């Protein structure tokens, strides 16, 4: 029996907001496949780095610095759920597997009121449901990783699944390489190295009717880096009567770093009628980083005594959200589209550090850290309206409440965007946005490394906020070319910069007093 695969049609009405907003870019699967490729694998973040107003930071890394902001100022959403860690291999690969990605919306200005929580940009990534009619999949091998994807119906026309797994295979190369180098090393030094990353995307979708759909989605990503070095040492000690004795020992250095993400969400899409849709999401999102290292310095004193100094330290950073959101999309008529919604997030920040120093048999153990919690509640409304044939407006307001023990804050965030059609081929656009950010990425360096940790605005640390004005001319040229010229002015307040001594790990007990507060303009 011949079958025709499902056809997907995107209406012009559904993209109305994209026509009004400044600084907006919509990317689909073909943009990733034929866009930037890293070691033969498509990469979402690398594709965004080529856009005007976006900087990559360190060469080849997955940094995203938008309109003068930091990498931590960007809101990354996977099917409406925030992600805190968005890269593998220290930033060389992004955490988004393009085998399951359906498309994304990227905003660097003109943010609609439905988005909030970060100052500089929004990367809203959506994944595909599984095929409801037939089974199919793909298998790809890259220079550093391999990808496997499979989807299909469980109950034809009703229930489907979509599963994708990506894994690096660098560990298969590192093990024999280090073994060969150790064999060739004549001074007895032994080195060890191992690195692996993998991520899993899975979704299960059931259609109860033409008006109700329930989806269970999961993402799990993990990196692990292990390094070790053993140095042989030979030392001489005088034991009496001028007699010297020679003994051999080893100095040791070992590091184990693990970091990753876990996202679980339950999505309910309900259609009230042909003009009103409601989406409700309940989710858990969490990110963790665990950095452990051990160092031992062997020394020989006398015939009977061998001593050593040793350090064993563990640094753990965890952040997680338990949250729910609901959004209503009401198409009042062909010229007016109203969106409104509410969200609640319970944030948990849990950084800790434990160290043990053994100095010639004298053990000194220390620990530091604190558990922080915060509650964030938001309401928003935005109206997309066409006034005649030439003018489109998107006006919205977002109200945010953020509460931590000892401090209650609330903010209004006005949003306004407009588009005026000068001719069939030329549009003028302008926007104003006000954003607040209540989460701070605490770092003692400028790299995206697992030693950084997320902490909330507290009684003593105010939230960051930005105001941005943008305007531009957007023109359509012959042969489907586009020429866009856009300018922006952005101010940022309550920015944090580490003011302590050079160290790899940020201070946990005194972090609120270890940073300078400043302002920024771009």
Model-derived features: positions:
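Face-selective signature of the C-terminal outer-membrane beta-barrel domain
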Residues: 205-223, 253-407, 421-424, 481-485
């Amino acid at each position: 029996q011949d079958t025709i695969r499902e056809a997907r049609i995107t209406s012009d009405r559904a993209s109305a907001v994209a026509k009004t907003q400044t600084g907006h870019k919509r990317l689909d699967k073909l943009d990733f496949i034929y866009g930037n490729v890293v070691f033969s694998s498509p990469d979402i973040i690398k594709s965004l780095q080529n856009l005007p107003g976006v900087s990559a930071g360190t060469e080849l890394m997955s940094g995203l610095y938008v309109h003068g902001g930091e990498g931590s100022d960007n809101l990354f959403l996977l099917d409406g759920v925030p992600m805190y860690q968005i890269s593998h291999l220290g930033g060389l690969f992004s955490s988004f597997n393009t085998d399951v990605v359906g498309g994304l919306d990227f905003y660097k200005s003109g943010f609609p009121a439905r988005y909030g929580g970060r100052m500089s940009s929004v990367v809203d990534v959506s994944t595909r449901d599984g095929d409801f009619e037939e089974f199919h999949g793909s298998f790809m091998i890259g220079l550093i990783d391999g990808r496997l994807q499979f989807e299909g119906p469980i109950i034809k026309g009703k229930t489907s699944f979509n599963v994708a797994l990506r894994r690096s295979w660098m560990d298969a190369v590192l093990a024999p390489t280090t073994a060969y180098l150790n064999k060739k090393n004549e001074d007895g030094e032994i080195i060890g190295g191992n690195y692996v990353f993998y991520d899993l995307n899975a979704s299960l979708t059931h259609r109860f009717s033409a008006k109700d759909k329930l989806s269970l989605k999961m993402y799990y990503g993990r990196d692990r880096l292990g390094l070790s070095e053993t140095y042989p040492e030979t030392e001489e000690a005088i034991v009496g009567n001028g007699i010297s004795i020679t003994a051999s020992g080893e100095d040791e250095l070992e590091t184990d770093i693990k970091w990753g993400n876990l996202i679980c969400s339950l999505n309910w899409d309900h259609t009230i009628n042909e003009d009103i849709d409601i989406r409700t999401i309940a989710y858990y999102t969490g990110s963790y980083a665990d950095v452990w290292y051990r160092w031992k310095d062997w020394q020989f004193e006398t015939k009977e005594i061998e001593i050593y100094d040793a350090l064993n330290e563990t640094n753990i950073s965890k952040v997680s959200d338990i949250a729910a959101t609901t959004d209503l999309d009401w198409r009042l008529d062909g010229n007016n589209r109203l969106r409104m919604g509410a969200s609640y997030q319970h944030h948990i920040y849990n950084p800790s550090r434990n160290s043990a120093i053994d100095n010639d048999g004298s053990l000194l153990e220390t620990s530091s850290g604190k558990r922080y919690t915060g509650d964030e509640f938001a309401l928003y409304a935005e109206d997309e309206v066409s006034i005649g044939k030439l003018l489109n407006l998107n006006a919205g307001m977002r109200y945010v409440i953020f509460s931590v023990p000892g401090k209650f804050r609330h903010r209004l965030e006005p949003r306004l965007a407009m588009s005026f059609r000068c001719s069939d081929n030329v549009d003028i656009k302008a926007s104003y946005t006000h954003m607040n950010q209540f989460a701070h990425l605490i770092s003692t360096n400028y790299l995206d490394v697992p030693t950084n940790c997320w902490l909330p605005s507290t009684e003593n640390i105010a939230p960051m906020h930005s105001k941005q004005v943008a305007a531009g001319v957007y023109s359509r040229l012959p042969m489907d070319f586009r020429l866009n010229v856009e300018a922006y002015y952005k101010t940022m307040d309550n920015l944090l910069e580490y003011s302590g001594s050079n160290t790899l790990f940020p201070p946990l007990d005194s972090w609120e007093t270890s940073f300078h507060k400043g302002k920024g303009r771009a």
